[in-house]
């Protein structure tokens, strides 16, 4: 069992609480507002809320076309608008899923560096529990670019990319999957669940009204999709609902590399990227979904368009964290914005 001192997490949280910041209540309808930036630039990250704080881990950036893979963890305290750095990951990762399991923080899978390349999909799973980050049961198969949520006290991972053949190290070695797994903390094992209706990667997810929602994403061959799928754990059933609309500004489909959180009884999706001959671009759009009406409404655009960003909601406020500011790699940032939908 690998153990990393988690007291840094606890100390960081305590230190943040003593900083001389005054939390200001944000009102709905004012649009996205700037918050304290993540101290380092990074993209291809995920996050989860643990004890009222937002935790990110890993990621990548590509200055001068050189891929740099992160092993840092960041802890954001919304009450003080301050960041602290947590303990380093056991190994560098980009696209690792950050999720809670019954409230306990987990960091799972993602891509690491190996002799085969910088896109080696991993099976590792680490859990922060007590004063250590410990190795728990690995994934049944390598997985990256997935959706991770805490549903019914279990960590669920849905869709993503993994190698279907022996090769595992390059981006092209990975394929889109509809896999759906759930981690049982008491049994320390992953259970195979009903797969998603569509294989895709780089989607976004959230829990709302006791269900797991997966929105957007893309396929290698088909590009972005606005598809919205809902998993009902009680009936073990997937339903497909109204998709995210195409971007009015570009005509392109909002899909891959977006982020989403649930707040105020609604889903809030934003960001992402699209590819096109000669380039592509990054979305600033925000879309708000009302589950009662099965309808998406355009929300205020982010101040900084981004993809590969992280999303979380705390006390009704949605946070958009870091991400790539140009299509693909090349300009990662640490910008943080907040919205009350």
Language model features with spans:
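Kelch-like beta-propeller repeat domains
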Residues: 5, 13, 26-341
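N-terminal export signals
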Residues: 2, 8-25
């Amino acid at each position: 069992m690998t153990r990393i001192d988690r007291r840094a997490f606890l100390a960081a949280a305590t230190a943040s609480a003593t900083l001389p910041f005054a939390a200001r209540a944000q009102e709905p309808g004012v649009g996205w507002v700037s918050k304290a930036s993540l101290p380092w630039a990074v993209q291809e990250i995920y996050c989860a809320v643990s004890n009222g704080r937002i935790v990110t881990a890993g990621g990548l950036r590509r200055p001068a076309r050189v891929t740099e893979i992160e092993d840092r963890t960041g802890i954001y305290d919304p009450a003080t608008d301050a960041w602290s750095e947590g303990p380093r990951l056991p190994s560098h990762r980009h696209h690792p899923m950050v999720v809670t399991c019954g409230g306990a923080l987990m960091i799972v899978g993602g891509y690491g560096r190996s002799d085969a390349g910088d896109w080696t999909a991993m099976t590792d799973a680490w859990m922060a529990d007590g004063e250590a980050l410990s190795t728990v049961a690995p994934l049944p198969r390598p997985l990256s670019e997935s959706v991770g949520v805490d549903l019914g006290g279990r960590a669920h991972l849905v869709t993503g990319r993994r190698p279907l053949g022996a090769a595992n190290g390059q981006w092209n070695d990975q394929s889109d999957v509809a896999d759906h797994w759930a981690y049982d903390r008491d049994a320390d094992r992953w259970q195979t669940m009903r797969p998603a209706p569509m294989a895709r990667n780089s989607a976004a997810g959230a829990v709302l009204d006791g269900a797991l929602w997966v929105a957007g994403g893309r396929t290698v061959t088909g590009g972005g999709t606005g598809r919205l799928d809902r998993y009902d754990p009680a009936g073990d059933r997937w339903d497909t609902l109204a998709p995210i609309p195409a971007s009015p500004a570009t005509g392109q489909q909002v899909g891959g590399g977006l982020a989403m959180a649930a707040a105020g009884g609604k889903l809030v999706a934003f960001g992402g990227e699209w590819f096109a001959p000669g380039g592509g671009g990054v979305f600033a759009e925000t879309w708000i979904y009302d589950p009662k009406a099965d309808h998406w409404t355009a929300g205020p655009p982010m101040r900084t368009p981004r993809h590969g960003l992280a999303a979380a909601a705390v006390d009704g406020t949605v946070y958009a964290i870091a991400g790539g500011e140009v299509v693909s790699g090349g300009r990662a940032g640490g910008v943080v914005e907040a919205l009350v939908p």
